[in-house]
Amino acid sequence: MDAESLHRLALPVSAVAFLLFALVLPTARLSRRTGRAAFVLHRRANPFQRVIGVCMGLFILGLTAWSALYAALGPESLGVWPVPDALRWLGWAMMAAGLVLVLVAQVQMGASWRVGIDREPTALVTDGLFSVVRNPIFAGMLWVVVGMACVTPSAWTWMACADYVLLVSLQVRLEEEHLARLHGPAYREYAARVGRFLPGVGRLAAAEVTA
């Protein structure tokens, strides 16, 4: 099997693995342990949260469909740019590292993990990966998305990266407001000390986090 055939076979397998290990299994585990739902993007009273939830769902479906089309049709049909194999293998490494980051962060969140903003109170997690950045799950997912763009570089995949950054930036700001209301000074001190997606970058002054 040549390298191109391997890439075409591995991409949809990787997409399914990500959905299984990063979404389906953690959701089932949380429901079994706590009786609560993990997906709460649609429950928020703020209609903007629901719009973000729909866009996130479409984004995931789009990447999954892209993976399947890449396997079925090949790079030329999708307008994938020819790039050195080294960049594509770097992309695979980024996808693997991003998935590991997501899984570790989910385990460290424990019963506090949600997809979206839950009306029910959850504990503030500030240790482990969360002592390095406030949003390691979103950061790990960005590694996965950028890695996929390196494996199948095209106008579509790099636009997907930009879309992901926009959606996550909007979602994180809603979550920051919610956490400030829920945890008060404890969250404001944490947000002033720890970066948003990168260590030391995106720390908030107390005035920026409204309660």
Describe the function of each predicted region:
Residues 1-119, 123-126, 144-211:
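Membrane-anchoring alpha-helices and their flanking helix-loop junctions
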